């Protein structure tokens, strides 16, 4: 387990009041009075992954009956980019080939959410999920593809709404065997054809 930390809500509230003052707003005006508290509550949720070791969700597993791939496709995803503390939102596709153990599908959802709920980079998030499935679970291989819109690209900087960033991480047998990797990627791409 990672070192326990907890979100300091009162400190966030004070910081948000200071930000409001710094941008020339009145934190006491109607509409903003409760904003510091709301932001602190939102951050407690958005960064709740800092208080856990997401890989711990893989500790409860079951004997595998096959070595066929397991794929969760189109898993909704939201995280906060660590560069600007703006969201990136999209979907994750997560696959693994069991060795001796499998996990419940909801555990994979919790794994992704645990890594997503922290200041994050999409590239790192993709690798962390793939590594946990490969190393912690001890799978034969894993593939993780994340497609997300980075709001820092949408709202500032390049200002290109709708741009999707795609990252992938491939581990183990799925990295070594082009045929198996292609099979997984074809299954993932079916979601794009569904519309």
What are these regions (language model features)?
Residues 1-195:
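A domain-level signal for the structural core that forms small-molecule/cofactor-binding pockets
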